[in-house]
Every structure is written in structure tokens, then in C-alpha cells.
């Protein structure tokens, strides 16, 4: 019954299965392999931080809000509905590095307040300005990587890109 081991041997992103509907970003966290991922989380191996960058973006949560699940009014992460179908185009190494670097800036902004939990970091009424700035920079990189021709200012613009990318990927 408990014979299946899924703990990765590298750093991984712990992805909470549920986040509050008030969240502007998915509250994921990078953990070392020595930290056991509990059953209230999903995980994706992420030795370089690229996956963290994507899941921490407005592009991801826009897709999650639209095609992901819910429990009551909160968002429910699904690897099959939202993660495995997230339509990321082929990325060159320079683009990947920019997303990784921008994701690291999000982590750096969180580290400025080590006493705060993830819930406290992302309280919409108390999110630190430096964390907002870091997420804005990450959004610019992810949006550009996903094909945005200009700065995106709405969820609708992000959804248009997501659905266009998805349609392109399923056509082959």
C-alpha cells in the first residue's frame, strides 16, 4: 500500500493542491529533496527553477482559474487539467535563463521577510511591494516566452495567448 516512493532526488516545486480564490499568484515553493512533500501538495522536479518560474506567473494562474478545478470557491490544482496541458512553446536557453532568474528574484523578495509564511507573503492586503515588483518582472518574462507581443495588462490577454498556444500545440 505504501510502497510507492515519489520523492525526487533533486530540488522540487511543492505545489499546494488548493489555494485561496483571493490569490493573485499560485503559492508554490522550492524544496530540497530532504524535505518530504506531503499529500496536500503536488510536486514537480525542478533542479534549475524553470518550473517554479512558470507556476509562479500570472500566466499560469490565469489558466488555472479558467480550466482548473475548484473546491468551494478556492482553486484546486490538477496535474492533468492545468499543469500537463499548460501550453509552453519551445524555449531557447536564453529565454529559460531569464525566467529562472526572474523566478529567483521572487524567492529573493520572499527571503527579505523570512518570518512570513507563504500565506502571509501572498495576503492581498499585505503583499510586500518588492514581491509585487519581482512577480511583475517574472510575468514580463513568462508572457514574452509564451508569445506576448507587448506587455499584458489583463487576464483575458493571457487567456487568448494560452488558448492560441494550446490550439497550435494540439494541431502539431
Protein language model features and the residues they cover:
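Non-catalytic DNA-recognition/assembly elements of restriction-modification systems
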Residues: 85-172
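Polybasic, glycine- and aromatic-enriched phosphate-binding surface used to engage nucleic acids
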Residues: 1-101, 105, 167-172
Amino acid at each position: 500500500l505504501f510502497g510507492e516512493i515519489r520523492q525526487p532526488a533533486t530540488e522540487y516545486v511543492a505545489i499546494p493542491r488548493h489555494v485561496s480564490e483571493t490569490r493573485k499568484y499560485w503559492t508554490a515553493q522550492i524544496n530540497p529533496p530532504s524535505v518530504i512533500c506531503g499529500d496536500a501538495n503536488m510536486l514537480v522536479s525542478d533542479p534549475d527553477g524553470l518550473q517554479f518560474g512558470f507556476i509562479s506567473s500570472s500566466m499560469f494562474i490565469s489558466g488555472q482559474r479558467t480550466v482548473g478545478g475548484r473546491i468551494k470557491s478556492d482553486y484546486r490544482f490538477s496535474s492533468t487539467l492545468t499543469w500537463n496541458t499548460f501550453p509552453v512553446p519551445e524555449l531557447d536557453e536564453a529565454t529559460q535563463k531569464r525566467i529562472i532568474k526572474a523566478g529567483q528574484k521572487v524567492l529573493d523578495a520572499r527571503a527579505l521577510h523570512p518570518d512570513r509564511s507563504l500565506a502571509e507573503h501572498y495576503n492581498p492586503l499585505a503583499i510586500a511591494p518588492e514581491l509585487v515588483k519581482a512577480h511583475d518582472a517574472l510575468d514580463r518574462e513568462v508572457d514574452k516566452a509564451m508569445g506576448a507581443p507587448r506587455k499584458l495588462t489583463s487576464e483575458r490577454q493571457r487567456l487568448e495567448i494560452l488558448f492560441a498556444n494550446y490550439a497550435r500545440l494540439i494541431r502539431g
